[in-house]
Amino acid sequence: MAPRKPKVVSVTKKKKVVEETIKVTVTEEGDPCVITETANDQETQDLTFSIPVGENVTTVEIPVEVPDERSLPVGENVTTVKIPVDDRDESSPQPPETPVEVRDEPSPQPPETPASKSEGTLKKTDKVEKKQENKKKKKKKKRDDLAGDEYRRYVYKVMKQVHPDLGITSKAMTVVNMFMGDMFERIAQEAARLSDYTKRRTLSSREIEAAVRLVLPGELSRHAVAEGSKAVSNFVGYDSRKR
């Protein structure tokens, strides 16, 4: 869309100059006599200005002086004319007006007061204590899981080998488990006493076999020693067979 041309209004300014003649005569008495003569409408000057009428105008004040050596103007011989000047170029397109967004600034929040050092240290100590308690609980659970089977697994396997059709209750299995634990404790105590007699700090197979014969009765002790020596020989010779 082409820009609109501004409207032009012509203004005519007329200036009227009044000429005044002053005659001064001095008499013998010493009193001066002043005579003034005025001549009106001696010069008339027409000033024509073209004033464009537009939307965006700027007002500029231009003083105009018309000097005349022959005439003495009344008052200041200056005419002030306001000429609106259009800043826009007719050929240049008008730039589109950009909308201005008004954003609501968030109200400033009061600064947060830092927590005291004592509260921070208390929180840290509480966290450390909770972590330690959790670790202890995990260790206890692992121990319970490991000690839960104890000798039950081995006793059940041996029982199925000897009597595959025979079953056993959980209470009977706990009794057998406790019996096996007590028996091994007594064997360890007897072996420790024998090592004290020989003044040795390391238990050997001799002390273990002697402790088994002392704890278990006759035939059971001989069977246990034979099976134990067989298991040890198999364990030691496993690497040689693997090669």
Swiss-Prot record:
Under Gene Ontology molecular function, one entry of this record is: structural constituent of chromatin
Please give the InterPro entries that the UniProt record associates with this protein. Answer: Histone-fold, Histone_H2A/H2B/H3, Histone_H2B
User: Cellular location of this protein?
Assistant: Nucleus; Chromosome
Q: Which residues are annotated as modified residue N,N,N-trimethylalanine in the UniProt record?
A: 2
Which residue positions does N-methylalanine occur at?
2
- Residues annotated as signal peptide: none
Q: Classify the source by domain of life.
A: Eukaryota
Per the record, where are the segments of Basic and acidic residues compositional bias? 120-132
The keyword Acetylation is assigned to this record: yes
Instruction: Enumerate the residue ranges of region (Disordered).
Output: 67-145
GO CC, alphabetical: nucleosome; nucleus
- Which keywords label this protein? Acetylation, Chromosome, DNA-binding, Methylation, Nucleosome core, Nucleus
Report the main location listed first in the record: nucleus
Q: How is it modified after translation?
A: Can be acetylated to form H2BK6ac.
This protein is called Histone H2B.2
